[in-house]
Amino acid sequence: MQRRDFLKSTVAVAVAAELGMGKAEAKVPAHNWGNYNFGSGPQVADRLNQGPFPQYPPDAVIPTDDVVMTTTSSEDIVPNYGKGLVTYITADSGTEEIKSDNIPQAVEDLVRLPLGQQLYVRPTWREIQPRPGRLELPDYLKLVFELAKKNNKRVGLRVQMCAPDYKHEAALPDFVLDKVPKVDLVLSDQESAASGKRFLENPHSRYQPRYDHPFFQQAFKELVGQLAAEFDGNPLIEFIDTFMYGFWGEGHTWPFANNPFPDYLTAERTWTNMLEVQLEHFKKTPLLTNTQPDYSRVGNSEMLDRTVRSNNWIRSDTIFIENEQIEALSNRPPWIAALLEQGLPGKPPDPGAAHEGISPAENMIDHVMDIGANYWSLWNFHQISAKNLMSYYQAFPAAFDRISRRIGYRVRPSFIWSYKDEGYLGLIIG
């Protein structure tokens, strides 16, 4: 074969392979979120007449109106759906993270904490479904829901399938582990050894299951169905986190070079199918998907895109690391709520840690507001207690009060007009 013919044929094969891969992969390349076409947003049913309401001929549709009332903004903290500071009851390591000799009392103190308007729990699959067939909530979760109802607060929920900080037991139930193959995790390089140490020393986090295995998928669908039957549309539930794999959020598998899948396409197909299962079951309660970059190459970009296009919500587990996440959070469509999880230190406030007069906590709060978050975590990292949270409020009350008033949305009827039309009294709200 002549060299020129060889080069032509090689290029043709490469182009064909690239086109084939493009058709097979659903991966969404990195993009700016501002003006990105995510669709027109959710349809709003039963809306009142949105106007216009001209009052002078020839366009008049109402008689002359008069302003009968105006309102002014309030400095009060107004709890509402879709916004607020979220008190973390459990996070990475279950009730072991609650620093108290009396867990029930500590849970009650956290629920009653006036600083938080919402609550959050993060149990493992094993904790809520140790056996197939039905949910069996542990006592601490039952207590959280009972106290939430008494204190007029709602609960956000994530169920973990991988929890490297649970050292006493695996996150998955035995009935799944016994029937699903597992793949050992491998460090990417020696520089990651220190970061991966806590995972490798825990026998329950040294591996990942073959999520694509038929038995795993069958058990997962049953779990999601049971969760939806219990929580979708439940007035106590504010939101549900989607199941994910990777850098942040579910698993924290970022020190490792491998994942449990044979190839990217299998990983992407598995996780997007699992997201679709959740979207099919949860029609009333919002689902939150993490904006984490796809470090582990499992299809996170497609999951995030489908989440936004289905008018569900997003979340992040950091504020100061990847610029990709800040881009997504800051420029998301206006109908998409965002939760920002950024833990406060587990130790008391340190006056010496301030930089140019700004403490780390105040800096964090300012940047959570900068991205326009709807929710922010009240969480002392791996040192959960109402006392720890209050120590930060007492040290920086102005910052906490400011975010409590500003987070989410503040909507009020500013102008109110009144008119009479054929004997009927009408109001226009603006």
Model-derived segments and spans:
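Surface beta-strand/loop "capping" patches
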Residues: 402-430
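The substrate-binding groove and active-site-proximal loops of carbohydrate-active enzymes
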Residues: 125-135, 204-218, 260-265
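Conserved, mostly hydrophobic/aromatic
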Residues: 119, 227, 240, 429
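N-terminal export signals
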Residues: 5-26
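Active-site-adjacent "subsite" loops/lids of carbohydrate-active enzymes
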Residues: 163-226
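Aromatic-lined substrate-binding rim segments of carbohydrate-active enzymes
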Residues: 113, 121-188
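A eukaryote-biased signal for short, well-structured alpha-helical docking elements
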Residues: 379-406
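Catalytic-core regions of glycoside hydrolase
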Residues: 37-107, 149-153, 239-389
